[in-house]
């Protein structure tokens, strides 16, 4: 019988998070160490998570004793753009549980984060992973690693049957599956199998711990929170995306050059993504809306600015599987470079298992609301309808309701 899919402890170390959390955390340390933020948890499909509150609290409390050890620190020191002062700070960092509020409210599990951005930023990914795994081990207590592994090999067989050798040589796929994974053990097994046997090009993982353990590349640049926070960090709202991109450029000097486009909408983003940014950033990340139509806008924008699209890369990360990735790859091949970050479909695709639809999103920065509109109406998120309406007015975004 194969090994259980579950470990007693869900999050084992500080690096069991997405790489862009560390890159943004460094940016916060250097630029906004005094910013205060609030976050709220949402279960999009209304699943009743109240029975798991005790187990979630138990795993949450165990985050408080996590520290960075010498081996993990040595791994991070090899990443040139992580600066010595940030690594010293991370060596001293501890999760402060007084910034986390969890309980039952309105007959639902509620979870809120409130505190300094610098000290709250690392909570998101492990908290979501904890909620997902606690739920899964209650619903599927006898799940074995072999079931996840067998499902992944079936996907490899499908890909070999449907893609040519030339296509496989160019098809770049990464693991972006930490936050809604079935379990930590399943994600590690999936990433190990991808590294060893993926028929295309496996280019890395967003999970820093697995990158360290399995000797592969950690991947990620920025998340929505980086751009959202700038809506309340000082500049005029109309200049907030420009301020976010400009701060990133000053922090990383041309490295980590994949920009996220859908905090407001792709059209609003391209209005701010001028020749300066288009030359400095290596490419763009898609996270909502129809992917090929989005890519056509990106290609046209680069061409309008006199930039060869084949010098740039588009990263796709919105609810992908291998089938959809191959379709997008074929639609854009030879016109612009593409790469695919696949999450839940790699780390929580097991027969008989329904993945969770959960998010933990920033709602406020420095006491005022922030918003994500996105290129997909269902992904719009803000606690203040008036602020969303104001943002739509400022950026000339029509309402999709």
UniProtKB/Swiss-Prot annotation:
Keyword Phosphoprotein: yes
A GO BP entry: NAD biosynthetic process via the salvage pathway
Pfam assignment, any one: NAPRTase_N
GO molecular function, one term: nicotinate phosphoribosyltransferase activity
Reactions accelerated catalytically: nicotinate + 5-phospho-alpha-D-ribose 1-diphosphate + ATP + H2O = nicotinate beta-D-ribonucleotide + ADP + phosphate + diphosphate
Entry keywords, A to Z: Ligase, Phosphoprotein, Pyridine nucleotide biosynthesis
Positions bearing Phosphohistidine: 224
Known function: Catalyzes the synthesis of beta-nicotinate D-ribonucleotide from nicotinate and 5-phospho-D-ribose 1-phosphate at the expense of ATP.
HAMAP family: NAPRTase
The name this protein goes by in its record: Nicotinate phosphoribosyltransferase
